[in-house]
């Protein structure tokens, strides 16, 4: 197979041999990639690579290796015939363009000519007759080592940060850092760089410094890997929802209301008319006739879309005008939200969230990018969790049957250990961060934990009421909702059954001071009389005409990726982070 790969473009591109062998290069490279370790053998343990869950219709597709071997053998025979006719081995006459990740995984038995790689110079070490260049292109954490004779054309332009194309031989390396290296015969400087002023040097640079140059930060190996892992996560989620017959949607970014009712919104106005933000008498002059905001959640609009096509989802930016200057908060971040129609049980919503995250992790865990990131070597600063701890997180996320307990049971459990907390657990006051960490650590055993059925008065108005009459086991009314807690990071997701009945919804909105005016229980036009929900009138309308039971959830996408990568500050997970006082680039 190695011989076949080396000769992948010897014949004409129109031939079937070329088509077979061109596709073989990526297959061979993938098959030589080592499988990442995971404490337990996924094929033998409690995690199955073939079946995501008992309720999931998706099955991982496998290549028919016998058919693949037949095609390879056929191609090799045709190549041998061509060589016999020519009387000598065929040589490649066209360049072989490869990514650096492909090169580093490629270990041919003999040297390969006319290999081309492109990327950015990470470092240059000058010797008397040669320059040793480290090249990166974002496809791999590890750089490619290239040996460049000093008399090579344009070799003097090889400086840190330069964009270059190198052509040469791929040969076995006498050094220990990598099995092969490139002996360069041609250098093309595509984008010059001044090494003295380039802000990113080979030495370790702190996350705090890199945040001051967000436009250049992605060029560092770790940040490039984070970008690729983010892309792979989006691809895995998209496949999961497509396989489960969810419709991807694009809800609006501009909205007329604050979904959470917390008032933490950004108001939007044209730059030419900033005065309209404060002038209450200028309603007629406003661009949208009244104040509009950047969305804090797409949930309400997703509920409307779900009543059309059933199950829907989105991955959209949301905005919070919070002045929280912490490692967990941003003013702009991405939220994955999903809504399910015709469901009447919170367990169904939790099942979807659990299956989705587990599926995403299992899919990503097979990738070269994740394998390399979790098994990287070198300096581990305080900005990254050690790889062995991050591996344990992945194992927990890919495990089956995440624990579930009610909020009331959680409070009772915490009260048994009350002396360990700064804030004593009280049923009416919610869970503090220290409580969530304790639950995730001691109840989950490394797995995520669902906490359900929170007190009604500390949750949002749109959540369906559950137990409304207090008894010996439950001090007050609750709502059918959940928070998903993970060790170390705490909450990464929240969801609920939505209140689909008109009168209970209006009652809840009244308790939250959203409905203006009184209303009676008599129905007029399928709506209680006198009820005015203001900017949320349209949301109330959804309950007036054929609103089925439904539920959904939201996941802080950036926070989830922080957990899976070991990045300890969400500002380092987002390419261009915005938080209070900072909105660079």
Show where each model-derived region lies:
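Class II aminoacyl-tRNA synthetase catalytic cores and aaRS-like
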Residues: 2-585
């Amino acid at each position: 197979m190695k011989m076949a790969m080396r000769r992948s473009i010897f014949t004409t591109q129109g031939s079937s041999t070329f088509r077979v062998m061109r596709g073989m290069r990526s297959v061979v490279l993938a098959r030589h990639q080592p499988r990442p370790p995971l404490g337990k053998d996924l094929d033998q343990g409690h995690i199955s690579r073939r079946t995501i869950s008992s309720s999931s219709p998706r099955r991982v597709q496998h290549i028919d290796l016998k058919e693949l071997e037949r095609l390879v053998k056929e191609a090799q025979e045709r190549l041998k015939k061509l060589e016999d006719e020519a009387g000598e081995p065929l040589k490649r006459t066209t360049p072989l363009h490869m990514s650096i990740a492909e090169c580093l995984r490629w270990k041919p038995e003999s040297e390969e000519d006319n290999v081309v790689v492109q990327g950015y110079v990470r470092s240059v070490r000058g010797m008397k007759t040669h320059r040793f260049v480290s090249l990166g292109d974002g496809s791999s954490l590890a750089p490619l080592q290239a040996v460049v004779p000093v008399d090579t054309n344009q070799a003097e332009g090889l400086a840190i940060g330069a964009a270059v194309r190198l052509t040469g031989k791929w040969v076995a390396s006498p050094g220990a850092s990598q099995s092969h290296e490139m002996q360069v015969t041609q250098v093309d400087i595509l984008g010059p760089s001044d090494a003295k002023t380039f802000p990113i040097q080979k030495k370790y640079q702190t996350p705090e410094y890199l945040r001051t140059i967000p436009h250049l930060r992605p060029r560092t190996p770790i940040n490039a890997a984070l970008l690729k892992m983010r892309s792979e996560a989006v691809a895995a989620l998209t496949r999961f929802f497509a396989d489960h017959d969810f419709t991807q949607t694009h809800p609006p970014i501009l909205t007329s209301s604050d979904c959470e009712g917390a008032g933490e919104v950004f108001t939007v106005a044209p730059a030419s008319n900033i005065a309209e933000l404060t002038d209450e008498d200028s309603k007629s002059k406003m661009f949208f006739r009244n104040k509009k905001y950047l969305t804090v959640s797409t949930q309400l609009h997703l509920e409307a879309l779900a009543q059309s096509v059933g199950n829907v989802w989105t991955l959209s930016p949301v905005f919070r005008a919070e002045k929280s200057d912490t490692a967990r908060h941003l003013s702009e971040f991405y939220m994955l939200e999903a809504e399910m129609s015709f469901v009447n049980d919170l367990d169904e919503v939790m099942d979807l969230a659990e299956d989705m995250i587990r599926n995403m992790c299992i899919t990503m865990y097979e990738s070269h990018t994740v394998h390399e990131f979790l098994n990287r070597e070198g300096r581990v600063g305080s900005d990254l969790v050690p790889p062995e701890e991050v591996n344990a997180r992945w194992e927990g996320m890919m495990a089956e049957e995440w624990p579930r307990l009610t909020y009331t049971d959680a409070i009772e459990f915490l009260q048994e250990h009350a002396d360990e907390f700064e804030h004593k657990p009280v049923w009416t006051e919610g869970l503090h961060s220290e409580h969530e960490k304790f639950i995730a650590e001691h109840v989950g055993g490394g797995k995520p934990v669902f906490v359900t059925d929170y007190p009604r008065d500390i949750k949002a108005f749109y959540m369906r009421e559950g137990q409304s009459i207090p008894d010996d086991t439950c001090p007050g009314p609750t709502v059918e909702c959940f928070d998903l807690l993970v060790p170390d990071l705490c909450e990464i997701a929240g969801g609920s059954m939505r209140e689909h009945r008109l009168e209970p919804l209006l009652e809840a909105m009244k308790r939250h001071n959203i409905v203006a005016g009184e209303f009676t229980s008599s129905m007029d036009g399928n709506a209680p009389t006198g009820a005015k929900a203001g900017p949320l009138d349209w949301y109330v309308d959804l309950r007036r005409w054929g609103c089925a039971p439904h539920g959904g959830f939201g996941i802080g996408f950036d926070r989830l990726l922080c957990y899976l990568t070991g990045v300890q500050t969400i500002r380092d997970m987002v390419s261009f982070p915005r938080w209070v006082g900072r909105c660079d680039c």
